[in-house]
Design a protein with these regions (language model features):
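ATP-dependent carboxylate-amine ligase
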Residues: 2, 150, 169-171, 209, ...
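Residue-level signal for inorganic ion chemistry
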Residues: 7, 24, 51, 78, ...
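Conserved lysine of the Walker
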Residues: 30-33, 231
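Flexible active-site lid/hinge loop adjacent to a nucleotide/diphosphate
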Residues: 62, 68-163, 280
Length: 408
C-alpha cells in the first residue's frame, strides 16, 4: 500500500497527505454535515473540497456531477479528483462523506491522517450488504482506526466503544443534546420553521482544543429541524472553536443545507419538503421532528429495489405512526417488480390511509391535492436525485421538477 501511495504521489505530482481531511460517517446526515463543514471552512477563508453523495464542490463553485456511483471514492478516484482541481495552495481541506461500504472495503487506505473523524449516528441500513447490525456497526467504528486527534461520536453510540479493543487507549469525544455530562453538550434555546438558536457547552473538548474547556458558545442559524443542529454541532466541533467567540452570538445564517436535504420548497402557497430519507432511522428522526409544526403530514415515498428488504415494513410502520395519509410509489425499483416491493412493505401494515400509485409523478400530483395550510407534504427517498432506475433502465426524474410543474 505504501508503494501504491508513492506511485500515485509521483504520477499525479501531489502529496495527498498534505491535505486536511474531515471525515463523517453515520446512518444519516453524512451529506449535510460534510457540506456544512465545507461551508464553515470557506467562511474562514480556507480552500475546501466537499466529496460525497452530491458530487464534488470545490470552494464556491457549483457542485459537479458525481465521480462514480459510490458515496465515497476509492483512493485512486480521490487522487484523480484532487489532481484535477489545480488548487492554488500547498494543501486544502477535504470534507468527506464516508460510507460503511467504504470503511469495510478500506477505500481510504493511504490517507495517513484525518483532522477529525466523526460517527454521527448508527441506525440500521445496508443490511443487504453487511448482513446484520453488528457487522454494520463494526464498519462504522473502523473510522476510529484512522489516525486523528479529534474523534467525535454521538453519545448514544459511545457505549459501543467498549466492544472495540483498538479504542482502549483512544479518547472519543461524545456529543449530546440530552446528556448534559457528555463531553460536548448542546441545548436548543429557540427554534421555529426557519430559524434556530442554540448553545454549546465544552465540558471536555477534543484533543488540541483543551484551551476552550468549560467555555460556552452561543450560535444562531437558519437550519431546520432540530436534527440538523446535531449535524451543525458535529461540523463546528470538527473544525474546532478557535474561530468562534464565547463573548457574543456567532451568526451562522450563511449555512445552507444541500439540495434535497430537509429542503423546504419556497415561493409556493403550500408546505412541501423534499428529503433524502430512505431508511427507518431517518424516517423516525425526520417525521418526529416535523410533525410538531403541522396538524397533518402527507407522505410520498417508495422503497429501493434489490436492496435491504427487511427495512420496508419498518419504514411503513414508522410512516403510519407519524402521518395522516401515505402515497406509496416507486423509488428505483431496479429489477424488482413494484408489486412485490409493496407486498413486502405491507406485511403487518394493513391499517392506515394508504394509496398505492406506481407512477411517482402521479403520486406527487395526487398527494398535493390533499394539502391545506395546516398540512405538510413530505416527498421522501430521492432528495437531489434526478433519475429513476426501473427494469434495468435509467430515466430522467426529479421530485423538484414535478413540484415546480404543479405550482408554476
Amino acid at each position: 500500500k505504501k508503494n501504491i501511495i508513492k506511485f500515485l504521489d509521483s504520477f499525479y505530482s501531489i502529496d495527498i497527505n498534505s491535505n486536511n481531511f474531515f471525515a463523517f460517517t453515520g446512518t444519516n446526515g453524512k451529506s449535510s454535515t460534510a457540506y456544512i463543514c465545507h461551508q464553515l471552512l470557506r467562511n474562514m477563508d480556507y480552500e475546501s473540497l466537499y466529496v460525497g453523495t452530491l458530487g464534488i464542490k470545490h470552494n464556491d463553485e457549483k457542485i459537479q456531477t458525481k465521480f462514480s456511483n459510490k458515496t465515497t471514492p476509492d483512493i485512486f478516484e480521490l487522487y484523480e479528483i484532487i489532481s484535477s482541481l489545480n488548487f492554488g495552495l500547498d494543501s486544502m481541506s477535504v470534507c468527506l462523506e464516508v460510507s460503511s461500504h467504504a470503511l469495510d472495503q478500506n477505500r481510504l487506505d493511504g490517507i495517513q491522517w484525518l483532522n477529525s473523524a466523526s460517527i454521527l449516528n448508527i441506525g440500521e441500513d445496508h443490511l443487504d450488504y453487511h448482513k446484520d447490525i453488528s457487522s454494520y456497526r463494526d464498519s462504522k467504528f473502523r473510522i476510529f482506526k484512522m489516525n486523528s486527534p479529534i474523534k467525535l461520536v454521538i453519545d448514544e453510540s459511545n457505549n459501543f466503544a467498549k466492544d472495540y479493543n483498538f479504542l482502549n487507549e483512544t479518547k472519543l469525544t461524545s456529543i449530546s443534546s440530552k446528556n448534559n455530562f457528555s463531553d460536548i453538550f448542546y441545548k436548543i434555546t429557540k427554534a421555529n420553521f426557519k430559524n434556530c438558536e442554540f448553545k454549546i457547552f465544552l465540558n471536555n473538548p477534543p484533543s488540541g482544543q483543551e484551551i476552550h474547556k468549560n467555555k460556552k458558545y452561543k450560535f444562531k442559524c437558519a437550519l431546520f429541524p432540530e436534527f440538523n443542529i446535531t449535524n451543525l454541532v458535529f461540523a463546528i466541533s470538527s473544525v474546532g472553536f478557535d474561530e468562534f467567540s464565547d463573548k457574543y452570538v456567532n451568526d451562522l445564517s450563511f449555512i445552507k443545507l444541500p439540495k434535497g436535504r430537509t429542503e423546504v420548497i419556497n415561493n409556493i402557497s403550500k408546505n412541501i419538503i423534499i428529503d433524502y430519507a430512505h431508511n427507518s432511522h431517518s424516517f423516525e428522526v425526520l417525521l418526529c421532528s416535523i410533525k410538531k409544526y403541522f396538524d397533518n403530514l402527507i407522505l410520498v415515498f417508495g422503497f429501493g429495489g434489490d436492496r435491504d428488504k427487511s427495512k420496508r415494513a419498518k419504514m411503513l410502520q414508522i410512516a403510519l405512526d407519524n402521518s395522516s395519509k401515505i402515497f406509496l410509489t416507486s423509488d428505483n425499483s431496479r429489477s424488482e417488480k413494484f408489486e412485490n416491493i409493496i407486498k413486502d412493505a405491507m406485511k403487518g401494515n394493513n391499517e392506515g390511509d394508504i394509496t398505492i400509485i406506481e407512477d411517482r409523478k402521479e403520486a406527487i400530483i395526487n398527494a398535493n391535492k390533499f394539502l391545506d395550510k395546516n398540512s405538510c407534504l413530505l416527498i421522501l427517498g430521492k432528495g437531489h436525485e434526478q433519475t429513476q432506475e426501473i427494469d434495468g433502465k435509467i430515466y430522467h426524474f426529479s421530485d423538484h421538477e414535478v413540484v415546480d410543474e404543479i405550482y408554476n
